[in-house]
């Protein structure tokens, strides 16, 4: 499994590609940051983010894209830019038919460090250890992108099993629904509630 992790942002959009399967050693294929100038127009910045992500998709051909799920923050301007970059990342993947997964920061931290409250230094240290790197990737956005990819590789098998179980449950439930297409509805028993019968000229 080859996953492109994307830590969305307008000024710095972290990108990292990791290859491997759950339970086996993982390999970093590449890591970097797509940068845009804060002085540029918003539209131009989004185009730059799109082009940068497209370049990574062209070069590394990932089978999956993992993007950090955006949460509301006190700084509305920051969260808006992050959400816009996230949308661009998902669009780039969807346009190529690449499955996209969203992971919360706490999910990523828990998957990589064992604690959903780990700080960036701890995440960077564990990414370095798990991928057998000489030093933590810089800036932190790059390390976060690799952590996203690692998280998805480890969580994907469980998520797939859960989705399959839910789909199977829905299918079996639909086939047993009374009155469904091809399924006869319940028959009424004479004298049961909701029915009437005539007794000696009067209705019972």
From Swiss-Prot:
<keyword id="KW-0255">Endonuclease</keyword>
<dbReference type="GO" id="GO:0006310">
    <property type="term" value="P:DNA recombination"/>
</dbReference>
<keyword id="KW-0540">Nuclease</keyword>
<feature type="active site">
    <location>
        <position position="7"/>
    </location>
</feature>
<feature type="binding site">
    <location>
        <position position="7"/>
    </location>
    <ligand>
        <name>Mg(2+) 1</name>
    </ligand>
</feature>
<dbReference type="InterPro" id="IPR020563">
    <property type="entry name" value="X-over_junc_endoDNase_Mg_BS"/>
</dbReference>
<dbReference type="GO" id="GO:0000287">
    <property type="term" value="F:magnesium ion binding"/>
</dbReference>
<comment type="function">
    <text>The RuvA-RuvB-RuvC complex processes Holliday junction (HJ) DNA during genetic recombination and DNA repair. Endonuclease that resolves HJ intermediates. Cleaves cruciform DNA by making single-stranded nicks across the HJ at symmetrical positions within the homologous arms, yielding a 5'-phosphate and a 3'-hydroxyl group; requires a central core of homology in the junction. The consensus cleavage sequence is 5'-(A/T)TT(C/G)-3'. Cleavage occurs on the 3'-side of the TT dinucleotide at the point of strand exchange.</text>
</comment>
<keyword id="KW-0234">DNA repair</keyword>
<dbReference type="InterPro" id="IPR036397">
    <property type="entry name" value="RNaseH_sf"/>
</dbReference>
<keyword id="KW-0460">Magnesium</keyword>
<comment type="subunit">
    <text>Homodimer which binds Holliday junction (HJ) DNA. The HJ becomes 2-fold symmetrical on binding to RuvC with unstacked arms; it has a different conformation from HJ DNA in complex with RuvA. In the full resolvosome a probable DNA-RuvA(4)-RuvB(12)-RuvC(2) complex forms which resolves the HJ.</text>
</comment>
<keyword id="KW-0227">DNA damage</keyword>
<keyword id="KW-0479">Metal-binding</keyword>
<feature type="active site">
    <location>
        <position position="68"/>
    </location>
</feature>
<keyword id="KW-0233">DNA recombination</keyword>
<dbReference type="GO" id="GO:0008821">
    <property type="term" value="F:crossover junction DNA endonuclease activity"/>
</dbReference>
<dbReference type="Pfam" id="PF02075">
    <property type="entry name" value="RuvC"/>
</dbReference>
<keyword id="KW-0238">DNA-binding</keyword>
<feature type="binding site">
    <location>
        <position position="141"/>
    </location>
    <ligand>
        <name>Mg(2+) 1</name>
    </ligand>
</feature>
<keyword id="KW-0378">Hydrolase</keyword>
<feature type="binding site">
    <location>
        <position position="68"/>
    </location>
    <ligand>
        <name>Mg(2+) 2</name>
    </ligand>
</feature>
<comment type="similarity">
    <text>Belongs to the RuvC family.</text>
</comment>
<keyword id="KW-0963">Cytoplasm</keyword>
<dbReference type="GO" id="GO:0006281">
    <property type="term" value="P:DNA repair"/>
</dbReference>
<dbReference type="GO" id="GO:0003677">
    <property type="term" value="F:DNA binding"/>
</dbReference>
<feature type="region of interest" description="Disordered">
    <location>
        <begin position="164"/>
        <end position="204"/>
    </location>
</feature>
<feature type="active site">
    <location>
        <position position="141"/>
    </location>
</feature>
<protein>
    <recommendedName>
        <fullName>Crossover junction endodeoxyribonuclease RuvC</fullName>
        <ecNumber>3.1.21.10</ecNumber>
    </recommendedName>
</protein>
<dbReference type="GO" id="GO:0048476">
    <property type="term" value="C:Holliday junction resolvase complex"/>
</dbReference>
<dbReference type="InterPro" id="IPR002176">
    <property type="entry name" value="X-over_junc_endoDNase_RuvC"/>
</dbReference>
<dbReference type="GO" id="GO:0005737">
    <property type="term" value="C:cytoplasm"/>
</dbReference>
<dbReference type="InterPro" id="IPR012337">
    <property type="entry name" value="RNaseH-like_sf"/>
</dbReference>
């Amino acid at each position: 499994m080859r996953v492109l992790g994307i830590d969305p942002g307008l000024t710095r959009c972290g990108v990292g590609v990791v290859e491997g399967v759950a339970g086996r050693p993982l390999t970093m294929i590449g890591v970097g940051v797509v940068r845009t100038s804060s002085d540029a127009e918003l539209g131009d910045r989004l185009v730059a983010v799109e082009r940068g992500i497209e370049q990574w998709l062209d070069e590394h051909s990932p089978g999956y894209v993992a993007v950090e799920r955006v949460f509301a923050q006190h700084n509305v301007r920051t969260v808006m830019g992050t959400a816009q970059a996230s949308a661009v990342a998902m669009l780039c993947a969807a346009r190529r038919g690449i499955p996209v997964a969203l992971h919360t920061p706490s999910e990523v931290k828990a998957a990589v460090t064992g604690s959903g409250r780990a700080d960036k230094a701890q995440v960077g240290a564990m990414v370095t250890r798990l991928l057998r790197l000489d030093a933590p990737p810089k800036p932190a956005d790059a390390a976060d992108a690799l952590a996203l990819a690692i998280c998805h590789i480890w969580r994907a098998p469980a998520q797939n099993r859960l989705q399959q179980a839910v789909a199977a449950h829905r299918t079996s439930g639909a086939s047993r629904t009374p009155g469904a297409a091809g399924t006869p509805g319940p028959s009424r028993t004479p004298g049961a509630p909701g029915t009437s019968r005539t007794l000696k000229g009067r209705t019972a």
